[in-house]
């Protein structure tokens, strides 16, 4: 393509001010403290749909078992997180096929930072696979 219609690479940096951190989940812990999930969305496109983000979970944060309406890749950058019964330290790559569920997630004592990419519709559907089947019908 030529001129104004040419496609170009898009560059973002974790410290860019135009990409704010967003609190997307919060829980009250048994000891009265709160834990949160914060996300910084680097790309959120609709055609074709995809989402890439950096996520930070406070220590002890729990996210229910769920799945997404698209393939989902997670890479643990710092800290650790439990995914179900499996501990995932820094360096762990998790691949979730469309229609599969994972979790529950529980952030480790130091919290966790993860890079995530959802290659399609990023909305989640809980841990009931029949909901995904109904969406596909």
Where in the sequence are the language-model features?
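Conserved short histidine dyad/triad with adjacent acidic residue
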Residues: 35-67, 87, 97-101, 135
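A short secondary-structure junction signal
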Residues: 53, 126-128
